[in-house]
């Protein structure tokens, strides 16, 4: 027995792909795909940060970038942070539920804290909740979404002229690569893509990890062409 075809309001045959339920059962297009590391350079990351303005959304965006880049957090870990998970004096960030639900504490350098501080000041004026939240409208104070941040990274990178893939995990790769080049121990880097799993804390104290990262030198930042003196 043939099923009755779906028709639109004009009586024309309707494709199943036009129904909302059709796409709900489909996995995301990039599910299971693995992209090559190809981390962005310092110059590219800074260019993306400079492509934002000083409105609250831009200040928040720069804060998210430094947490992903200079602390090496996954996007899910960054968006799960609460204000109380940060210890600026100690230079530490507490990840309560990391990969495989593991709890860990990571360090973040002084330069990164200086770029997160403006958002921390603005965050105090918003409802209590996740560290990175929506700043306007009826959903003010609610957590940012991973999809929203990924889209903002992609769009802002295009504005900044960055032609490589610019996604949260690329910033995490950049964190690991830069620390390795700085001579920091792989035990400190704590990066799964460098074959560091649950073994990364064996034989090393968390205070040592945090101190090593907190004392990292600031990245070599190129001059901002917008503020360069004109001759």
Residues covered by each model-derived region:
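C-terminal catalytic core of Y-nucleophile DNA break-rejoin enzymes
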Residues: 34, 38, 98-118, 129-154
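Conserved tyrosine-mediated DNA breakage-rejoining catalytic core shared by Y-recombinases
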Residues: 1-23, 42, 76, 80-118
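Basic, Lys/Arg- and aromatic-enriched nucleic-acid-binding interface segment
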Residues: 42-75, 124-126, 172
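Catalytic-site neighborhood detector that most strongly recognizes the C-terminal catalytic loop/helix
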Residues: 97-100, 190-215
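C-terminal secondary-structure termini that scaffold catalytic or DNA-interacting sites
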Residues: 1-28, 36-39, 137, 214-231
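Short pre-functional
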Residues: 62-74, 92-94, 177-178, 202
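A short, glycine-centered helix-capping/turn motif at helix boundaries
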Residues: 67-80, 100, 182-184, 191-192
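Short, basic (Lys/Arg/His-rich) helix/loop patches that form interaction surfaces
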Residues: 50-57, 106, 126-127, 150-187, ...
């Amino acid at each position: 027995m043939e099923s009755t075809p779906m028709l639109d309001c004009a009586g024309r045959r309707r494709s199943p792909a036009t129904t909302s339920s059709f796409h709900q059962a489909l996995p995301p297009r990039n599910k299971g795909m693995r992209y090559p590391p190809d981390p962005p350079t310092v110059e590219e990351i800074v260019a993306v940060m400079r492509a934002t303005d000083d409105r609250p959304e831009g200040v928040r965006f720069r804060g998210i970038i430094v947490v992903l880049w200079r602390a090496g957090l996954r996007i899910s870990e960054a968006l799960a942070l609460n204000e109380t998970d940060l210890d600026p004096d100690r230079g530490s960030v507490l990840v309560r539920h990391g990969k495989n639900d593991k709890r860990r504490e990571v360090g973040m350098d002084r330069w990164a804290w200086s770029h997160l501080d403006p958002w921390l000041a603005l965050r105090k004026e918003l409802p209590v909740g996740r560290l990175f939240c929506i700043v306007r409208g009826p959903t003010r104070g609610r957590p940012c979404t991973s999809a929203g941040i990924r889209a903002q990274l992609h769009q802002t990178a295009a504005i900044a002229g960055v032609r490589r893939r610019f996604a949260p995990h690329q910033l995490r790769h950049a964190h690991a690569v830069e620390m390795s080049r700085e001579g920091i121990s792989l035990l400190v880097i704590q990066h799964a893509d460098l074959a560091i799993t649950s073994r990364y804390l064996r034989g090393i104290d968390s205070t040592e990890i945090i101190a090593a990262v907190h004392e990292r030198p600031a990245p070599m930042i190129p001059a901002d062409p917008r503020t360069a003196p004109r001759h």
